[in-house]
Amino acid sequence: MITVAKDGSGDYTSVQEAIDSITSVPETVFIKNGIYKERVEIHKDNITLIGENADGTVITNNYYAFMPMEDGSKRGTFRSYTFFVQANHFNAYNITFENSAGFGKKVGQAIAVYAEGDDLVFKNCHMLGHQDTLFTGPLPMKEKQPGGFVGPTEFAPRIPGHQLYEDCFISGEVDFIFGSAICYFKNCELYALNRNETINSYYTAPSTYEGQKYGYVFESCSFSGNCPPRTTMLSRPWRIYAKVVLIRCDLSEQVSETGFHDWNKPESHETCYYAEYACTGKGYVPERRPDYVHQLTEREAGEYTREKVFGR
């Protein structure tokens, strides 16, 4: 095990230095409490990061999409991340990942965690940001604007992996969980930030691939925040085959009675898949949901277990 400590009591004082030192895997990096102001990238399989505790072990940075680059261009969404992992069999426990750039209206997108690979696990982690907090790669098949995908996986194969988020706290405003991966969220809190708009937040914006069985599945999660009543949306489709299923989730009064938004893509009514089962809270108003939102039977909900979605 490698130990990171800001006070010099470990093997390294920087998380990235510890990662770079790894010559054989599997390897575990223990990170003592501290504020680690750095960007961290992981490209090696079979690495585990363990923080001392989620409130005290913080990896933070403040890059953002509107940030000017030396060549006169903007940094863009996919080069704004604080933490980047493109690997398989990765685990993170008890860590806060933060992008502190601020509200999207001022800085644009600002990713805290950019996660791509298969068998990625985040447990008891905090992911703090505003617009586009958590990106669950891969990217969509095609960009809509030239240069829109500039970043570390722009030319990587588009292979959706399996990701697990358990007992995590994820905050943001616009589309703060987005991407094409197969993700299972268990006992997580999604916290929407008020930006004083008619619609303050879209919790999720999946870009699930056509023909992919699963997209985002949330089990026993809470959708909360500090927004006025009926001013948040559970999801909207970044791409038209988006899939989101909520199982026994608690939906606060902040959630709009319609719950889901089509992003002005009426064709998505026939192609996306939004569904709920046995949810609770003032934001769960099934009779007001759009016709394209499904209310599952117990048998149908049985297709969305952790084992079936994540694989174990």
Give, region by region, the residue ranges found by the protein language model.
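Sequence-level preference for short, compositionally simple segments enriched
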Residues: 1-312
